[in-house]
A protein has these predicted regions:
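Residues at or immediately preceding the N-termini of alpha-helices
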Residues: 4, 23, 41, 225-229, ...
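Rossmann-like NAD(P) dinucleotide-binding subdomain of oxidoreductase/dehydrogenase enzymes
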Residues: 88-230, 353
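Conserved C-terminal structural/oligomerization subdomain of aldehyde/semialdehyde dehydrogenase
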Residues: 13, 22-25, 324-482
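N-terminal Rossmann-like NAD(P)+-binding subdomain of aldehyde/semialdehyde dehydrogenases
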Residues: 1-99, 472, 476, 481
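Structural signal for hydrophobic packing residues in well-ordered secondary-structure cores
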Residues: 34-37, 41, 52, 75-82, ...
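ALDH superfamily catalytic-core signature
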Residues: 191-333, 396, 468-481
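Residue-level signal for inorganic ion chemistry
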Residues: 26, 71, 132, 163, ...
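Conserved residues at the C-terminal ends of beta-strands
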Residues: 111, 169, 187, 238, ...
């Protein structure tokens, strides 16, 4: 970290040179990212296995493949994203034009999380590069193999005058936060998000905070056994099959009517074994918990006797191998930690309700989540979920898939996050849209200049009310002020 300030100043100066604004530079850096992913795919999967115990197919599905898609999407849309957009002016603005011109913010900081160490590092970087910024990436120290690959190999594919990867723990993060940035993009916990936001206040630095929360899944009385089976499969893969539930958009808990709860639970028991095997610890289909601290946190969530009594499936833990079995609970106490804190692991509480409609009030009694998942064929209930709840995203009849949609913004609301990214939304979050107006010297709004009189006031009134007929009548002397 010696010479950090001088290195960062050099990157600021490089941005001021204007080189990163060129479309060819942006394309070359995006292609460099793509080459990194293609040529180090095996190393990426190996690092994800070492850090989190992810199966290589899961690693490809959730990180390698997602990033490949995102970069290709950015390369395809880049020139259009960079182009200015015309803005419509009132008709009275003769011989005038206006446009929105996107320009890079400047020098940005990206601080990523450990659960998807490549995806959550490079996805925002795609947007920052596409927008023409210089940047520093600080990957999470809790995924050391992945962070090492990013720090030691990624720079060989990119312009090191514009992109720098800095490894380290909280002390390094704190030192970086003391610097002046044009934007800070952070993915992680709400606790650290508050620290980021507090540090940003010093320089009035804008922030994007991708946080999390307790994402609910509402299961309605679906119309057929097929629909029920599809629902269960999608719930299980979204909860236990995505980094063992260590994902900000993973299902945190399920809401279901009492009369359907037993049907749901029994089918889940069967499908867990089919999907993850009789012994998931041996089949390598469920990722490991990232470290001992998080393992003990999950263990403590089950320590309460009332919570233990609500376990209907699973519950076993292997501290040596940081493995937690997929676990289902039915109606744990609502004031227990497992129902008040984000779980971030393979523990799935099911809360039973008298009516599925009660789920709306239940969800609204808690902070706005990053995502809500509703499995239902009832159009009226869908409309109510859409109009009466608030969340970063709302998905009907599936879960987590919204993360892969480049056409949709990804981000939270309230305590689940600030800002959005993915696709063009990533470009936008690292851009400033400059408002540009052009006027001719040939015409003017002469009635905007003193000295004042009632005639000018009439013209101003007509102008601000878009009353072009009234303006004509004033000019012709056919309309006077009352």
């Amino acid at each position: 970290m010696e010479g950090l300030e001088s290195d960062l100043e050099g990157m600021r100066q490089y941005f001021r040179s204007g080189k990163t604004k060129d479309v060819a530079w942006r394309q070359s850096q995006l292609k460099g990212l793509l080459s990194f992913i293609k040529e180090t795919e095996r190393d990426m999967c190996k690092a994800l296995k070492e850090d989190l115990g992810k199966h290589h197919v899961e690693a490809y599905r959730d990180e390698v493949g997602i990033l490949t898609k995102s970069i290709n999407f950015a390369l395809h849309g880049l020139k259009e994203w960079m182009s200015s957009k015309k803005a419509k002016l009132p008709r009275v603005a003769l011989l005038s034009s206006a446009e929105l011109v996107p320009e890079p913010l400047g020098f940005v900081l990206i601080i990523s999380s450990w659960n998807f160490p490549f995806g959550l590092s490079l996805e925002p970087m795609i947007g920052a590069i596409a927008a023409g910024n210089t940047m520093v990436l600080k990957p999470s120290e809790l995924a050391p193999a992945s962070a090492s690959l990013l720090a030691n190999v990624l720079p060989t594919y990119l312009d090191n005058s514009a992109v720098k990867v800095i490894q380290g723990g909280p002390a390094v993060g704190e030192r970086l936060l003391q610097q002046k940035w044009d934007k800070i993009f952070f993915t992680g916990s709400a606790r650290v998000g508050r620290i980021i936001m507090s540090a940003a206040v010093k320089h009035l630095t804008p922030v994007a905070l991708e946080l999390g929360g307790k994402c609910p899944a509402v299961v309605d009385s679906v119309s057929s056994s097929w629909d029920t089976k599809v629902t269960v499969n999608r719930i299980l893969v979204s909860k236990f099959g995505a980094c063992a539930g260590q994902a900000c958009i993973a299902i945190d808990y399920i809401l279901v009517e009492k009369r359907f709860a037993s049907i749901l639970v029994e089918l889940m028991k069967v499908m867990i074994k089919k999907m993850f095997g009789e012994n998931p610890r041996e089949t390598n289909t469920v990722a490991r918990i990232v470290n001992e601290q998080h393992f003990l946190r999950l263990k403590n969530l089950l320590s309460d006797s009332a919570v233990q009594n609500s376990i209907v499936y699973g519950g076993s833990m292997d501290e040596k191998n940081l493995f937690v079995e997929p676990t289902i609970l039915v109606d744990p106490p609502l004031d227990a930690a497992i129902m008040t804190e984000e779980i971030f692991g393979p523990l799935l509480p099911i809360i039973t309700l008298d009516k599925v409609e009660d789920s709306i009030a239940f969800i609204n009694s808690k902070p706005k989540p990053l995502a809500i998942y509703a499995f239902t064929n009832n159009e009226k209930f869908r409309r109510r979920m859409l109009s009466e709840t608030s969340s970063g995203s709302l998905v009907f009849n599936d879960a987590v898939i919204q993360y892969a949609a480049d056409a949709l913004p990804f981000g939270g609301i309230g305590e689940s996050g600030i800002g959005k990214y993915h696709g063009k939304f990533s470009f936008d979050t690292f851009s400033h849209y400059k408002a540009v107006t052009r006027r001719s010297f040939l015409t003017d709004f002469w009635f905007r200049f003193p000295p004042w009189n009632d005639y000018k006031l009439l013209l101003l009134e007509a102008t601000y009310n878009y009353d072009y007929l009234g303006m004509l009548l004033v000019i012709l002397g056919l309309k006077r002020r009352r």
